[in-house]
């Protein structure tokens, strides 16, 4: 009888020991899985729009860090809202479509954008005494870049001989023009204008930019052109002369733009299609 009792107690202890081993193995496995688990870098990874929420949390943290409560004011900061707006004008923020490129794309909703703009305005209205480089750098990311700042076109200057150089294009023709103050000579590929262009229309188109700014007979034009036909070359020279005039006087740009000689004409002859006589003309239909 005592032998049976001892056997039963031994079996129970073995089972308990095996259960403890299983629990320990399971615990170690979970610890290893927790170590190997991929943790997202952003805290907003599991939100509906992580990119937008990350920017919102960044702006809110800056407001909490630097903005004073409404009950507190710095000494010497008793100014009205109008004066504050004059001292710290509100910039033009990026549009909804531009913000969607960096703020979640199709996940971005108009209410998200409104909340984003409200936070930017609050951060921009912080007392100037509290504004630092951290706030300025954050706000500069979302200010709309003007056309002048985005293009950053370098202003051309005259060369050592007092000439302005410009390149114009039209259809398959390309022209390079050297413009210098003089008595009104025009040479094209080393030949006189009347000798190179036989059509009156082509000669008039070359002189048109000078006529627009009342400068006929005040500049010498030396042009080299290649490619295309006579009309294409003439309009390419016209385009180059207009660009060269801006080097002498950039204030002429509105007049030349209104005349339509600053912007390049990108129109080309439409190609012929298979089964058609020309670009769009169909063969004559015959019943038989």
Curated annotation (Swiss-Prot):
**Pfam families linked:** Ribosomal_S9
- Subcellular location, in the record's words? Mitochondrion
List, alphabetically, the Gene3D superfamilies matched.
3.30.230.10
Disordered: annotated span: 269-288
State the Gene Ontology terms under molecular function.
Answer: RNA binding; structural constituent of ribosome
Q: Which GO terms describe its cellular component?
A: mitochondrial small ribosomal subunit
Organism superkingdom: Eukaryota
Q: Which UniProt keywords apply?
A: Mitochondrion, Ribonucleoprotein, Ribosomal protein, Transit peptide
Q: Does the keyword Transit peptide apply?
A: yes
Single Gene Ontology BP annotation: translation
UniProt cross-references to InterPro entries, sorted A to Z: Ribosomal_Su5_D2-typ_SF (IPR020568), Ribosomal_uS9 (IPR000754), Ribosomal_uS9_bac/plastid (IPR023035), Ribosomal_uS9_CS (IPR020574), Ribsml_uS5_D2-typ_fold_subgr (IPR014721)
PROSITE patterns, A to Z? RIBOSOMAL_S9
The entry sums up its family as follows: Belongs to the universal ribosomal protein uS9 family.
Q: This protein is called what?
A: Small ribosomal subunit protein uS9m
């Amino acid at each position: 009888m005592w032998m049976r009792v001892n056997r039963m107690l031994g079996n129970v202890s073995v089972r308990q020991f095996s259960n403890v081993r299983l629990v320990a193995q399971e615990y170690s496995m979970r610890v290893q899985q927790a170590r190997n688990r991929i943790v997202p870098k952003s805290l907003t990874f599991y939100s509906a729009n992580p990119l937008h929420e990350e920017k919102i949390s960044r702006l809110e943290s800056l407001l909490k860090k630097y903005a004073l409560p409404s009950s507190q004011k710095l000494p010497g900061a008793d100014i009205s809202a109008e004066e504050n707006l004059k001292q710290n004008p509100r910039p033009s923020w990026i549009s909804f479509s531009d913000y969607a490129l960096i703020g979640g794309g199709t996940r971005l909703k108009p209410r998200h954008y409104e909340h984003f703009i409200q936070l930017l305005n609050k951060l921009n209205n912080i007392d100037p005494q509290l504004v630092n480089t951290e706030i300025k750098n954050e706000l500069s990311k979302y200010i709309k870049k003007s056309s002048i700042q985005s293009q950053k076109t370098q202003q051309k200057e005259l060369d050592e001989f007092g000439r302005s150089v410009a390149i114009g294009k039209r259809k398959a023709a390309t022209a390079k023009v050297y413009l210098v103050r003089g008595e009104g000579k025009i040479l094209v590929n080393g030949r006189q204008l009347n000798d190179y262009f036989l059509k009156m229309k082509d000669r008039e188109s070359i002189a048109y930019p000078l006529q627009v700014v009342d400068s006929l007979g005040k500049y010498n034009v030396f042009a080299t052109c290649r490619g295309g036909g006579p009309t294409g070359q003439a309009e390419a020279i016209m385009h180059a002369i207009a660009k060269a005039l801006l080097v002498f006087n950039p204030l002429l740009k509105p007049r030349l733009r209104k005349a339509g000689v600053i912007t390049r004409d990108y129109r080309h002859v439409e190609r012929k299609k298979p089964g058609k006589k020309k670009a769009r003309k169909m063969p004559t239909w015959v019943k038989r």
